[in-house]
UniProtKB/Swiss-Prot annotation:
Entry binding sites for ATP: G9, S10, G47, R51, T141, N142, Y147, D150
Organism: Methanococcus maripaludis (strain C6 / ATCC BAA-1332)
Gene that this sequence comes from: pyrH
Reported regulation of activity: Inhibited by UTP.
Entry protein name: Uridylate kinase
Reactions catalysed, as given in the entry: UMP + ATP = UDP + ADP
Record text on subunit structure and interactions: Homohexamer.
Location(s) in or outside the cell: Cytoplasm
Listed GO CC annotations: cytoplasm
Molecular function per GO: ATP binding; UMP kinase activity
Function (record text): Catalyzes the reversible phosphorylation of UMP to UDP.
Annotated positions binding UMP: G46, D67, T115, H116, P117, A118, H119, T120, T121
Alphabetized Pfam families for the sequence: AA_kinase
Family: Belongs to the UMP kinase family.
Pathway(s) served: Pyrimidine metabolism; CTP biosynthesis via de novo pathway; UDP from UMP (UMPK route): step 1/1
Length: 225
């Protein structure tokens, strides 16, 4: 199966900072998926690395330039994961989908970050999945699925086990699009998922759920066309 993962930067690089063990655990999960015969692509977010830089830069510059800073942070995080993957990856972070596809055609795990200002890595992962005709998009984040409202702000939020892409659009329609913003699925990514009719799964960004996402045994939300 051809699977694209959107790996949240905040799960790879939490507030506590880089952890060799944490990064290695993710690398081992992706290696195992490759060994199982899956073609694996990973789009890594900027997470706290990006937000720290952006919060300072925002005092001096505009959102577009802050986006550029965020993109560089995603590529730094990508390089960390690439280093942990060893021979299963290529020591290069592609900046466009054509170069990304070349890496996949080398039978390697593809790891990349952001590409353009105003595009979150969720949107990049959805577009990549459409570009390579992936069978599945998995969004691995710091929330364990899609809720009817933001569970971080609403104690009565209800997790949805299964929704369709139109329902996803309704839920995500009013989310923030500023540099460094971090919703479960951002509005642009939701539109691409709907347009491309992508089967998508949103799971808690831990190695166990990443492995379970290629089966029906995950604990997240399944989004169907």
């Amino acid at each position: 199966m051809d699977v694209v993962f959107a790996l949240g930067g905040s799960v790879l690089m939490p507030k506590e900072g880089a952890s060799t063990e944490n990064i290695q655990n993710y690398a081992e999960a992706f290696k195992k998926l490759k060994e199982m015969g899956h073609r694996v692509s990973v789009v890594v977010g900027g997470g706290n690395t990006a937000r720290q830089y952006i919060s300072v830069a925002r005092e001096f510059t505009n959102e577009s330039f802050c986006d550029e800073i965020g993109i560089l942070a995603t590529r730094m995080n990508s390089m960390l994961l690439i280093s942990a993957l060893g021979k299963d990856a290529v020591k290069h972070v592609p900046e466009n989908f054509k170069d990304a596809e070349l890496i996949l055609n080398m039978d390697k795990i593809l790891v990349m970050g952001g590409t353009h200002p105003a595009h979150t890595t969720d949107a990049v992962s959805a577009t990549l999945a459409e570009f390579i005709d992936a069978d599945l998009l998995v969004i691995a984040t710091n929330v364990d699925g899609v809720y009817d409202k933001d569970p971080r702000c609403n104690e009565d939020a209800v997790k949805l086990d299964k929704i369709n892409t139109k329902e996803l659009l309704e839920i995500t329609g009013s989310a923030s699009m500023s540099a460094g913003s971090s919703g479960v699925v951002d509005p642009l990514a939701s539109k691409i998922i709907d347009r491309a009719k992508l089967k998508t799964i949103v799971v808690k960004g831990i190695p166990e759920e990443i492995l379970a996402s290629v089966t029906e045994n995950h604990n997240g939300t399944t989004i169907t066309p």
